[in-house]
UniProtKB/Swiss-Prot annotation:
EC number(s) per entry: 3.1.1.1, 3.1.4.3
Recorded GO MF terms: carboxylesterase activity; phosphatidylcholine phospholipase C activity; phospholipase C activity; triacylglycerol lipase activity
Induction summary: Induced by acidic pH.
Protein name, as recorded: Carboxylesterase/phospholipase LipF
Gene assigned in the entry: lipF
InterPro entries registered for this protein in UniProt: AB_hydrolase_3, AB_hydrolase_fold, GDXG_lipolytic_enzyme, Lipase_GDXG_put_SER_AS
Keyword Isomerase: no
Temperature dependence per UniProt: Optimum temperature is 35 degrees Celsius.
GO cellular-component term (any): extracellular region
Length: 373
């Protein structure tokens, strides 16, 4: 059992299916660590990735071959017995991942919709395969990871459309909202929260949200002014200048009603009907700002929000599973949260008439196949 230090008392079950949060404040827990392996991983990130981020931030106006990152990660082969299937969406693809022993995505049980990070400009199912494979096992669930369109060629709105299409694909398989957990890391945390808010317009409420080292606010200033900008093992301050420029350029290319796409800030639209939310974040990274700000806004609105802070780790240290013990521990905790959040949902497939081919909604989103996967 992991040890931790709670900044405030923890409810016996933490955040689960409850729509309320204890006395309107988020639960925040500081985990033990870092281990020697965690320290070494953070040092390696500081010595290699952070300098590359610094150089890349100066070269951001140039067309950088960022798609190579996910392509190169194809060498990370899935573990023995892991099943990966490519799913075609209207404007993108996704990969359905099942760890050994996990049932097919047939509308029964639970399912995780995973939105990868990478500053909206890079990465994909291959770069995040270790996290997704492990999460499928710990959550005892299929995981659908979306290879959404990236900026600056496409806009954030287009990326969110792809995530929404993936959610509709799961609904077409027979999953009900209370069987679906939205999860994302870094920029994928932004997409997970924004998707949950878009689903509110359809009166759909997923079982829960999981955000790992999440970027929840596009505004760069608060992060650049945060004390952790000096201790972050991955992001230099200038990286957020580059990200802001990329996002603006992408929005300008996507005209909506004759004007550039509006930039959407999810934290400005928090409502009490959002699902319970679990956030894992490093205590040394600058995105601790977004994690704590987001949890505070959720809790103030009456949404159960829990933050687990991991001291001394690199951004998205979960990628280092199983080499870093805290990475495995974090993913195991997330898997337990997902199982708890979906424990009350019925495990039988449901009527799919709203989503069958030929219905107005299916026609507008594209028809999806129904074969077992």
């Amino acid at each position: 059992m992991s040890s931790y230090y709670a900044r405030r008392p923890l409810q016996s079950s933490g955040c689960s299916n409850s729509d309320s949060c204890w006395d309107g404040a988020p639960i925040e827990i500081t985990e033990s660590g870092p281990s020697v392996a965690g320290r070494l991983a953070a040092l390696a990130s500081r010595m290699t990735i952070k300098p590359l981020m610094t150089v890349g931030s100066y070269l951001s106006p140039l067309p950088l071959p960022l798609g190579f990152v996910d392509f190169a990660c194809r060498v990370w082969r899935p573990g023995q017995g892991t099943v990966r299937t490519t799913i075609n969406l209207p404007n993108a693809t996704a990969q359905l991942v099942r760890a050994p022993g996990v049932r097919a995505a047939d509308g029964a049980g639970r399912v995780v919709l995973y939105l990868h990070g990478g500053a909206f400009v890079m990465c994909g199912p291959n770069s995040h395969s270790r996290i997704v494979n492990a999460l499928s096992g710990f959550a005892e669930s299929p995981v659908l990871i979306v290879d959404y369109r990236l900026i600056p060629k496409h806009s954030l709105g287009m990326a969110l459309d792809d995530c929404h299409d993936a959610y509709q694909w799961l609904r077409a398989r027979g999953y009900r909202p209370e069987q679906i957990v939205l999860a994302g890391d870094s920029a994928g945390g932004y997409l997970a929260l924004a998707l949950a808010q878009r689903l509110q317009c359809d009166d759909e409420k997923p079982a829960a949200i999981v955000a790992i080292s999440p970027l929840l606010q596009l505004a760069k200033g608060p992060k650049q002014d945060h004390p952790n900008i000096g201790t972050d093992a991955m992001f230099p301050a200038r990286a957020f200048d580059a990200l802001a420029a990329w996002v603006r350029a992408a929005a300008a290319k996507n005209m909506v009603d004759g004007r550039p796409e509006d930039l959407y800030e999810p934290l400005d639209h928090i409502e009490s009907s959002l699902p319970p939310t679990l956030i894992h974040v490093s205590g040394s990274e600058v995105l601790l700002h977004d994690a704590q700000l987001g949890a505070g806004k959720l809790a103030a609105a009456g949404v159960c929000a829990e933050v687990r802070v991991w001291p001394g780790q690199a951004h998205l240290f979960q990628l280092a599973t199983p080499l870093v013990p805290e990475a495995t521990r974090s993913l195991r905790q997330i898997g337990q949260f997902i199982r708890d959040a979906t424990a009350d949902s019925s495990l039988s497939p449901v009527h799919r008439s709203r989503y069958v081919a030929g219905s107005p909604r299916a026609a507008s989103r594209g028809a999806f196949g129904q074969s077992p996967i």
